[in-house]
Amino acid sequence: MIRARACVRRALFFVSLFFFPLFAQDARGGVERGVTGINAERPASRIPFINFDIREPQTNREVAFSVQLLLLLTLISLAPSILLLMTAFLRLSIVLDFIKRALSLQQVPPTQVLHGIALFLALFIMWPVFTEIYAKSFKPLTDGQVDIQTAYTEAERPLRVFMYRQMAHDPSSVRLCMSMAKLPKPDTLADVPTYVLIPAFILHELTVAFQIGIFLYLPFIIVDMVVASILMSMGMIMLPPVQISLPFKLVLFVLVDGWNLLIDRLFHSFL
């Protein structure tokens, strides 16, 4: 009987140890909720109220503002395409992919890494252009010194100069796009519309990138041919030459300081 009572007491003791923290936590939570309810009228931080009201425009100024807002949203949605096709990113990404294939590398470096390298190199090359756009377009617009039309013109001019400067030595792409648009032969940059200059720049960048790719492939093709001829002379026809030539390609690329040489030539090709 005494043992039974002792067991019951021990059981009640352990139960109280288990449930007492839960009750204490619940009671503390109730107190905190009560305090929160008392201080509910005292917000810790002020959050601005934002209201999007869709209604009929009352004045012509409201109509113009709505159109400008739609144009701004359209420009923001086109920002990735502008970054990919109207900057140095197109040439850089294609050339980096060419060097990866010329070295017979399948997964190293990954495609996402190559695109990241091309993106930051493009930002590095385009930084003076972006700085000029910020100083002459974005900052005056935010300060209220110019309107949206003037800001657009000032932002467009540095990009047009950059694209036209790349095609100054070979304006064949400009002539081709001007002829397809049935426009007269331009004498200056101002005579080339932007909707013609952009596709001409894209065609020029594709042409230049493929020309660079040809020069990148030539030394590594020679290595492949030498390795293949040696394997055939030794009777190892079933052995893939790519597996044997890959280390020699890597050694050649490292010995000539390939990455620094490639990035340096790409950078100076835009100057």
From Swiss-Prot:
Membrane topology recorded in Swiss-Prot or TrEMBL: Multi-pass membrane protein
GO cellular component, one term: bacterial-type flagellum basal body
Xref: PROSITE patterns: FLIP_1 (PS01060), FLIP_2 (PS01061)
Domain of life according to the entry: Bacteria
Location(s), subcellular: Cell membrane; Bacterial flagellum basal body
InterPro entries membership: FliP, T3SS_IM_P
A Gene Ontology BP annotation from the UniProt entry: protein secretion
Keywords: Bacterial flagellum, Bacterial flagellum biogenesis, Bacterial flagellum protein export, Cell membrane, Membrane, Protein transport, Transmembrane, Transmembrane helix, Transport
First-listed, main subcellular location of the protein, grouped into a coarse class: membrane
Residue ranges crossing the lipid bilayer per the database entry: 11-31, 70-90, 113-133, 190-210, 212-232, 236-256
Family: Belongs to the FliP/MopC/SpaP family.
Described purpose of this protein according to its UniProt entry: Plays a role in the flagellum-specific transport system.
Protein name from the UniProt record: Flagellar biosynthetic protein FliP
Organism: Treponema pallidum (strain Nichols)
GN (gene name): fliP
